């Protein structure tokens, strides 16, 4: 069904019956994201314990602003808080990306069975609406500014459609200010804004032109002003413009930057900004100067590869117009840090590609270098080409391209050669020496911006102390030496940047070790030791068939699968807890999968307390329990799947 819709600003004015009508209750949910390169779990856990995630769900806050004003709306982000088991709601709206699909599916099933009207939307629903067939009552396909109010109107009249499709780009000049008041912004390191959608370039692997078109559309400066004014009283200092290319339409980008610079001066520089831009910004000194004056502290560049043949193949023409290494250094010289994405697996890539990528990344000094495998996303030109050539793996779903797997069959390497080379490259980039070398190569060119820097409220000395005691010192003498080397001959005014890079390096190193590298022999031996102790603690339940323990050593990450049947009581669970804690602490690439089957009622409270004790391991603990949500398992602390498997 293609919904017929009325513009939202007209829908909002329609008087539907009397004031005595009970407000419709809407709960919007952002499902838990599996750990990824961008999670920075180590930094959040060890350095910023009052923060739970990086970015809030801006899309849901925008959706809430598009909802009729008389509706009762709540937003839950499973990445920072548990989900309600029986919310006071009529409608459950679930958003998210491809990496969240597994959890989306579980939540849709759970809430639909409870009798709620469930709605799915977001980027993956827009790219692959057929994936949600039979899972949701309503599917929102495309940008929501027009079709979400249409759904709301239809629901109020009792005739909600099954699918609402927005085939054409919408005019962002009518997008309302997001409902930041519904977000728990204090739990995030960064707030999010959006100025534009769309990108003029057509990179073969990118889904942005498919989702948002090639003609960038922008909000007005008045809209941006209203959003900044809504954020400023919250005390947020770090703001991420989520635009896929902020300079996609340069005349309006220049006007935005001029406005932001004036706003910052007027209000004593309350914000530090970051965004995504194309690398050819380095060739526009005027625009770069405006970016710095507006208070942008970092940019994300899609460098992808230093190989010109691969860039040409991918349609990345904007990266061929200048020397990429020089371009990165231009940003440093303007006091702007660089994050970047890199890809291996292009058709022109060979076994030598990994060494070229390593040399470039090290020389560039880019610490937050997201190295991924080429992945074909549905509806992109790459996906369609590889599908025609029968080069898509059906056993791998497109999603997170940094997890060591891809649905692309490479051309000049075997699949195993590519994944092994990728894992080895990730390992090389996350050694302590490699982290330090990139810091030195960055700070050699970095010039501090003259724009005042707004701190985010964390006491720098306490964060530095945590970095040294929980990261540097625990890394051994080699790590201490690398840390001191990274600060050698560096101006003290830039030490904060070096420490930020170490925090990022430790986070990426932890993710790489857990999901990409094979565990060390020492870790395997430690696992076997504690596994035997665990089996001894649970020998009676195991002998009676009430408990099973299996160590799956050839998965990434390595999994300890523990199945607990009905008659395994709380005494046995308590005996196993300390051993499990030691095992997870010592074997840092291990994931515990706890399968609970029909536990006696008396054990439920104890299980919740037990999982709370293990909650600081976050994604490393997964609970498979059909009634996990019903029994109040905090799914923001441990990963939860509601489908039990044996």
What residue ranges belong to the model's regions?
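Radical SAM enzyme core and accessory elements
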Residues: 1-28, 35-37, 49, 72-75, ...
């Amino acid at each position: 069904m293609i919904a017929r819709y009325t513009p939202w600003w007209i829908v909002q004015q329609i008087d539907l019956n009397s004031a005595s009508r009970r407000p419709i209750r809407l709960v919007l949910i952002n499902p838990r994201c599996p750990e990824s390169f961008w999670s920075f779990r180590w930094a959040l856990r060890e350095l910023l314990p009052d923060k739970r995630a990086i970015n809030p769900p801006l899309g849901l806050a925008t959706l809430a602003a598009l909802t009729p004003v008389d509706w009762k709306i709540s937003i839950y982000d499973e990445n920072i808080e548990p989900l309600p088991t029986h919310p006071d709601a009529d409608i459950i709206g679930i958003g998210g990306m491809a990496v969240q699909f597994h959890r989306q599916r579980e939540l849709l099933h759970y809430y639909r069975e409870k009798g709620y009207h469930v709605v799915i939307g977001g980027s993956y629903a827009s790219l692959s609406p057929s994936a949600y067939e039979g899972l949701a009552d309503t599917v929102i396909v495309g940008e929501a500014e027009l079709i979400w109010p249409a759904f709301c109107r239809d629901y109020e009249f009792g005739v909600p459609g099954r699918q609402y499709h927005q085939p054409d780009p919408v005019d962002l000049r009518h997008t309302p200010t997001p409902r930041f008041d519904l977000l728990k912004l204090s739990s995030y390191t960064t707030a999010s804004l959006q100025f534009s959608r769309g990108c003029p370039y057509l990179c073969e692997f990118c889904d942005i032109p498919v989702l948002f078109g090639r003609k960038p559309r922008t909000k007005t400066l008045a809209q941006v002003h209203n959003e900044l004014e809504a954020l400023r009283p919250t005390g947020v200092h770090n703001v991420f413009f989520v635009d896929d290319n902020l300079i996609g339409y340069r005349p309006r980008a220049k006007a935005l930057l001029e406005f932001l610079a004036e706003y910052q001066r007027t209000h004593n520089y309350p914000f530090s900004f970051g965004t995504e831009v194309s690398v050819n910004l380095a060739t526009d000194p005027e625009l770069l100067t405006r970016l710095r004056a507006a208070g942008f502290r970092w940019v994300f560049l899609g460098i992808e590869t230093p190989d010109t043949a691969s860039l040409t193949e991918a349609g990345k023409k904007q990266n061929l117009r200048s020397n990429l290494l020089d371009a990165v250094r231009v940003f440093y010289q303007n006091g702007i840090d660089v994050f970047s994405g890199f890809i291996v697996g292009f058709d022109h890539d060979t076994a030598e590609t990994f060494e070229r990528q390593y040399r470039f990344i090290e020389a560039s000094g880019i610490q937050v270098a997201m190295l991924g495998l080429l992945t074909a996303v549905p509806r992109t030109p790459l996906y369609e080409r590889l599908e025609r050539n029968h080069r898509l793996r059906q056993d791998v779903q497109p999603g997170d391209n940094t997890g060591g797997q891809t649905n692309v069959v490479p051309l000049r390497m075997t699949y195993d050669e590519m994944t092994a080379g990728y894992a080895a490259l990730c390992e090389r980039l996350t050694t302590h020496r490699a982290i330090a070398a990139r810091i030195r190569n960055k700070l050699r060119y970095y010039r501090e911006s003259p724009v005042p820097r707004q701190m985010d409220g964390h006491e720098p000395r306490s964060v530095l102390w945590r970095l040294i005691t929980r990261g540097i010192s625990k890394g051994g003498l080699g790590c201490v030496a690398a840390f001191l080397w990274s600060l050698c001959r560096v101006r003290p005014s830039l030490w904060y940047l070096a420490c930020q890079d170490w925090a990022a390096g430790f986070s990426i190193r932890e993710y790489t070790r857990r999901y990409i590298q094979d565990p060390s022999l020492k870790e395997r031996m430690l696992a076997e030791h504690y596994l035997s102790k665990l089996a001894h603690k649970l020998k009676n339940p195991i002998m009676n068939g009430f408990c099973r323990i299996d160590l799956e050593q050839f998965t990434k990450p390595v999994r300890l699968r523990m199945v607990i049947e009905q008659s395994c009581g709380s005494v046995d669970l308590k005996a196993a807890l300390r051993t499990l804690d030691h095992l997870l602490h010592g074997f840092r690439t291990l994931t515990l999968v706890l399968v609970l089957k029909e536990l006696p009622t008396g054990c439920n409270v104890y299980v919740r307390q037990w999982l709370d004790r293990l909650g600081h391991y976050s994604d490393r603990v997964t609970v498979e329990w059909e009634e996990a949500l019903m029994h109040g398992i905090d799914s923001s602390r441990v990963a939860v799947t509601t489908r039990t498997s044996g």
